[in-house]
């Protein structure tokens, strides 16, 4: 009788590795700051814009930042 090779262990390991990689990507993505309401104080607006600026800098930074390209 011919033995049938079942790929269950290989598929399970591949799916587990994929889930670990996706989990690492989710952890590195920053959370977008919540927009303040219309009646917020200037201090809260200033904090929001500073957080938004930091968020945009992190999201749009170049992948080669810090690498010696030349």
From Swiss-Prot:
Pfam families found in the cross-reference section: Hormone_3 (PF00159)
Listed InterPro entries: Pancreatic_hormone-like
Biological process, per Gene Ontology: feeding behavior; neuropeptide signaling pathway
Signal peptide start-end: 1-23
Location in or out of the cell: Secreted
Gene Ontology MF terms in the entry: neuropeptide hormone activity; neuropeptide Y receptor binding
Keyword Secreted: yes
Main location, first listed in the record: secreted
Keyword Signal: yes
UniProtKB keywords: Secreted, Signal
Source species, domain of life: Eukaryota
CC terms in the record's Gene Ontology section: extracellular space
Family indicated by similarity: Belongs to the NPY family.
Protein name per its UniProtKB record: Putative peptide YY-3
Organism: Homo sapiens (Human)
Gene: PYY3
């Amino acid at each position: 009788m011919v033995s049938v090779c079942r790929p269950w262990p290989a598929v399970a390991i591949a799916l587990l590795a994929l889930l670990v990689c996706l989990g690492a990507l989710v952890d590195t993505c920053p959370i977008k700051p919540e927009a303040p309401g219309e009646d917020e104080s200037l201090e809260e607006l200033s904090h929001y814009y500073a957080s938004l600026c930091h968020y945009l800098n992190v999201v749009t930074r170049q992948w080669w930042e810090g690498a010696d390209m030349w």
